[in-house]
Amino acid sequence: NPDKQLEDEITKIHIENKDYGYRRVYRELRNRKIFVNKKKVQRIMQKLCFQVTSFTRKSRRYNSYKGNVGKIAPNRINRRFNTSVPHQKITTDTTEFKYYEIDNKGRMVIKKLYLDPFLDMFNGEVLSYGISKTPSAASVLSAQKQAIEITSDCPYRRTFHSDRGWAYQMGAYSSVLKENKIFQSMSRKGNCYDNSVMENFFGILKQEMYYGTTYYSFEELKDAIERYIKYYNEKRIKEKLGWMSPVEYRLNTLAA
C-alpha cells in the first residue's frame, strides 16, 4: 500500500484529535511538513472511516444573574473582541455540567459541576479556571487572581469582561480589579452576544468532550474538563490563528 505511511500519520492525528475533519487534518499534516492534496486526505479519512461525530444539544444556558446585587460596570468591550496584544482583553463566565452519582439508597441522582474560566480574547487561550460543585465565589476569585498574575506582563491597561452575574458584581471581585488598575466591563442585561467569545468556547468544549458522553462522578468529569482545556490550549489548531493552537500562536507572536 503506497499510502501506508500517510494513513499511519492520519491515524495518529485522528487519535490525538478526534474532532478534526479533513480540513484540519490536512493543515496538521502541513504543520508536520507532510504536503499532500486536500482531496486525498478526505479520501483516506473516508476509507479509514474517520468521521467526526458532532453532538449538539440545545441546553438551557446557566444564568448567574440575580438582579443588581452589587456594582454594574459599563460595557467597555462593546463587542470589540479583537486585539493584537496578548493578555490585554480577558473575558470570563460560568457554565454548568451534569454528572450522575448513586446515592446511599442505590438511586441514580443528577449532580452539577460549575466551570469558571478566564479566557484571553487575543488567542482564545484559557488562562485560568475554577471548578466547583456549587456556584462559588471562592472559585471565581481564585481563577481571577491567577488570571491577573498571568496577564501582569501586558504593557497596556487590561480589561476584564463578563456578564452581569452575581459573582462579577461582588465588591471582592471588582475591588481586586481596581487595585490592579484593570478596567471592568460587563455585557448589557440578558445579551449573550456581548460575550460571544466565551459562549463560543463553551459550545466547542461541550460539543467535543461532554455531549454524547455520560460522566459518573465529579472527579471523572473534572478530570475530563482539565484534560480538554490543556488539549484546547496546546494542541487544537484554529484557522483564525493561522492553523496554530492558542499557545503556539501567542509564542509565535511574542517571538516575531
Please provide the spans of the model-predicted regions:
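C-terminal domain-tail junction helix/linker
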Residues: K178-I182, I204-A256
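Mobile genetic element proteins and their domesticated derivatives, centered on retroelements
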Residues: I10, V25, V41, M45, ...
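Basic, flexible linker segments flanking DNA-binding modules
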Residues: N1-V85, N191, V247-T253
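Short small-residue beta-strand/loop micro-motif enriched in glycine and branched aliphatics
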Residues: N123-Y129, Q184-S187, Y211-G212
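An active-site-proximal beta-strand-loop segment
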Residues: R79-L127, K133
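Active-site beta-loop-alpha junctions of metal-dependent nucleic acid enzymes
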Residues: K111-K112, G130-D153
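RNase H-like two-metal-ion nuclease catalytic core shared by retroviral integrases
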Residues: S64, N68, S162-R164, M170-G171, ...
